[in-house]
Structures are given as structure tokens and as C-alpha cells.
UniProtKB/Swiss-Prot annotation:
Keywords: Cell inner membrane, Cell membrane, Electron transport, Heme, Iron, Membrane, Metal-binding, Transmembrane, Transmembrane helix, Transport. Binds 4 heme groups per subunit. The chain crosses the membrane at residues 15-35. GO terms for biological process: anaerobic respiration; denitrification pathway. InterPro entries: Cytochrome_c-type_ET (IPR051174), Multihaem_cyt_sf (IPR036280), NapC/NirT/NrfH (IPR024717), NapC/NirT_cyt_c_N (IPR005126), NapC/NirT_cytc_sf (IPR038266). It comes from the Bacteria. This is Putative tetraheme cytochrome-c type.
Amino acid sequence: MSKHAASSAKRFSLLALGLMFVGGIVFVWAVDFGIKTTNTLEFCTSCHTMQTNFEEYKESLHYKNTSGVQATCADCHVPKELGPKLVTKIVAAKDVYHEVMGTIDTPEKFEARRWYLANLVWKRLEASDSRECRSCHDYADMDLSEQSRSARSRHSAAQDKGQTCIECHKGVAHHEPTEPDDAS
């Protein structure tokens, strides 16, 4: 191989490496931008079928409370850790698909599937030991002496049994759907 050919190959390799590096940075930035954008309350409520959920959420303590801390859609529905977060984002793409395809594009169609959809969320939360709930609420951080007798008793028993939050707190931010007659 001539000196010129070797020099050209080296320049090409460095250019290719540089482009891959820049491409990697752009890719990571785009993924980060996409995650941050789709984690906003504005994005989550941009589909008109989510307006019912949004109105219910606005009635909950997760939206307005004495502490002034507001939990948004992503706080409850999107894991903080990168791996589970990416999986959740990929799985959530099906919701956009169903909105676009017309499966849940009206409040009536959404309500017809609400029990099924709620159960998907509940099963995911149970499987993760209510990971998203525990990012704000954790037995270890609870001051049981400040809770009502009933809450203190229930939280203490739930902790002893190793229960997860969602086992008792379904319908905490959205109305709990009623089980349809034909659900199994």
C-alpha cells in the first residue's frame, strides 16, 4: 500500500470515527429530549381521550394538596431508572397507536377499555413493588404517629406483610373503573 493510500485510509477512519462520535451524541441528545418532552403533563394530556383522566387527576391530592407538591403523570407512570423508563416509553407507544387508529379516540371507547387498561397499570405496579409510588412514599419514611389510627394500623400491617402500595391504593389519582360483567 502506498504512503498516500495509507494516509487516505487513516483520514477516512478518523473521519468515520468522528462522525460516529457526533452521531452518538446527537442520538443520546434526541433520546433525552424525547423522554423529557413525553414526560410533561402537557404531552400526556394532549390526546383528547386523556382529558377525562386529567379532570379526575385534578380532583386528587396528587394534583393539589396542602404540601404544594404535585405528582404529574410521569411521576406515577414512568420509572426513574433508565432501563425501565425506556421499556415503559416503548410500551407506551401502543397508546399513541390506539389513539391514532381510533381504538380509544373517544371518551366512550376509552371507558369501554378502561378496566383493561387500568389492570395493565396495576399489574405493572405490583410487579415493580409500586416502584413509582415509592419514589415519593416509602414505609421507612412514613411517620406513623402522624397518621390516623386506621392509616397507621393499615400501613403497619401492609409493611409487615410486604404489601405493595397499589394493592390498597387503586383509584388514588383517577377514578377506579368498575369491572365489566364480562371481565375475567
